[in-house]
Amino acid sequence: EFHRDITYQMEILGREHADFLGASVDRTVYTPGTFDMPLAVKKMLTEGDVDAVVTLGCIIEGATEHDEMIASQLTRKIMDLSLEYDKPVALGVPGPGMTKLEAQERIDYAKRAVEAAVKMVKRLREKT
């Protein structure tokens, strides 16, 4: 996986925060990069009993504008999947335009994404 040194720390922090919030992480799918996330998200939403999905990763700036295109498409597609399956899909993917150092400084985005997913699940249940 791209930038596994960073995403591993995000995963650990996200799991700890989920446990703190009383949520369980029942399934984890590792993707080679953020470009591959939408398919994994769709599989998780269609297979099994999933209340929400949290995406964790980082998009680091390269020599071209590729990072901006990937970030734009990723956010759009996971938003589409959330709406299509009526389940929260939280974005824990900082970027684009970041250096590796900036990505390391944003590892706590994992906590924010987990918290957003848990809050959305609770709020959606309140409305039904």
Predicted region positions:
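Glycine-rich phosphate-binding loop
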Residues: 39-78
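Short, acidic/small-residue loops that bind anionic groups at enzyme active sites
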Residues: 70-95
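Glycine-rich phosphate/diphosphate-binding loop of Rossmann-like nucleotide-binding domains
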Residues: 1-30
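Phosphate-binding/catalytic loops
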Residues: 96-108
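A charged, well-structured terminal subsegment
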Residues: 107-128
